[in-house]
Curated annotation (Swiss-Prot):
The keyword GTP-binding does not apply. One of its GO terms (cellular component) is viral capsid. GO terms for molecular function: RNA-directed RNA polymerase activity. Pfam families: Poty_coat. Belongs to the potyviridae genome polyprotein family. Residues 115-155 are annotated as: Disordered. The record marks Q114, A115 as: Cleavage. This is Genome polyprotein.
Length: 381
């Protein structure tokens, strides 16, 4: 005697669609095949439904990849009756699978889809259930509630509130809100991607290509040059007033590169271009400190005494929300000290303007200077 469930309950297992993945749906139908053993017609109906289901998407793609599970009748017999499969059965089974066409034909079985009748799901239960459906209902997590734990008491649920609701005051134009809250709830861009302290990606691409063309080097050689430029900028800064050449070491040999293409093509500024190297520069300083004490020149000039803050001691470091408070304070203090004595003048001396006055002053050798006369030894100031 093999204990069996009611046929109606097994049908529910095969038609239930609460799986997050399509593979889980197929596994549930195979479980229904196992439970239906002993009901020959029900097993056949489930197999027919499974065959039809594998022709639909996304299950057809899973079957083509060989990931669709299946339970053979010989496996069920081994499971329930512990009867091994002999060689003759395997031979007949193999020949049948070779001879079968894609269309599987049955003698007298019929499959009923889209039925309108309701059936009793249990012997003593009077609850009605939905009939077996031939169409596949798309699985979605939206709108579904969590299963109720039968071991708990009460039916109270904890309400969830939204961080942004439609009841708050919002900017409006002609009586309509100008914001889309659904998009705003999901819109969380990276700070560095929208920060105006670094150049945009298109500006960086333009600068990179312009420098490569100016240096007349290939795509494969350019990353090596960028390595040297980043290390040089860590030591010497990214001031717009730098000129001349920058140096990269090739072993013990110094290789010079002109700074003009680097500075002239940097838009908006060289510091905003080099901000793209901030994370790599920080990791580079940390790597150097693992081998030997290393403090960038930016920190040495500011007399930074804490070696643990060396990774923040370069002027194109990008301060983010993840920057520690102590490191942020040290970086801002170093920046303030560097800018304290700096003076920026909008206009310099205009060399295109000449004087229109005629100088009638006459001086002799006794005069102290071209702009100062003497009178009997008395100097007129």
């Amino acid at each position: 005697y093999v204990p069996k469930l009611e046929e109606e309950r097994i049908v529910i297992y095969s038609t239930m669609d609460r799986a997050d993945l399509a593979e889980h749906r197929l596994e549930a139908i195979c479980a229904a095949m196992i439970e239906s053993w002993g009901y020959s017609e029900l097993t056949h109906q489930i197999r027919r439904f499974y065959s039809w289901l594998l022709q639909q998407q996304p299950f057809a793609s899973i079957a083509q990849e060989g990931k669709a599970p299946y339970i053979a009748s010989m496996a069920l017999r081994k499971l329930y009756m512990d009867r091994a499969v002999d060689e003759e059965e395997l031979r007949v089974f193999t020949e049948m699978m070779v001879a079968l066409d894609d269309e599987f034909e049955c003698d007298s079985y019929e499959v009923h889809h889209q039925a309108n009748d309701t059936i009793d799901t249990g012997g003593n239960s009077k609850k009605d259930v939905k009939p077996e459906q031939g169409s596949i209902q798309p699985s979605s997590n939206k709108g579904k509630e969590k299963d109720v734990n039968a071991g708990t008491s009460g039916t109270h649920t904890v309400p969830r509130i939204k961080a942004i609701t439609a009841k708050m005051r919002m900017p409006k134009s002609k009586g309509a809100a100008v914001l889309k809250l659904d998009h705003l709830l999901e819109y969380a861009p990276q700070q560095i991607d929208i920060s105006n302290t670094r150049a945009t990606q298109s500006q960086f691409d333009t600068w990179y290509e312009a420098v490569r063309v100016a240096y007349d080097i290939g795509e494969t050689e350019m990353p090596t040059v960028m390595n040297g430029l980043m290390v040089w900028c860590i030591e010497n800064g990214t001031s717009p007033n730098i000129n001349g050449v920058w140096v990269m070491m090739d072993g013990s040999e110094q290789v010079e590169y002109p700074l003009k293409p680097i500075v002239e093509n940097a838009k908006p500024t060289l510091r905003q271009i080099m901000a793209h190297f901030s994370d790599v520069a920080e990791a580079y300083i940390e790597m150097r400190n693992k081998k030997e004490p290393y403090m960038p020149r930016y920190g040495l000039v500011r007399n930074l005494r804490d070696a643990s803050l060396a990774r923040y001691a370069f002027d194109f470091y990008e301060v983010t929300s993840r920057t520690p408070v102590r490191a942020r304070e040290a970086h801002i203090q170093m920046k303030a000290a560097a800018l304290k004595s700096a003076q920026s003048r909008l206009f310099g001396l205009d060399g295109g303007v000449s004087t229109q006055e005629e100088n009638t002053e006459r001086h002799t050798t006794e005069d102290v200077s071209p702009s100062m006369h003497t009178l009997l030894g008395v100097k007129n100031m």
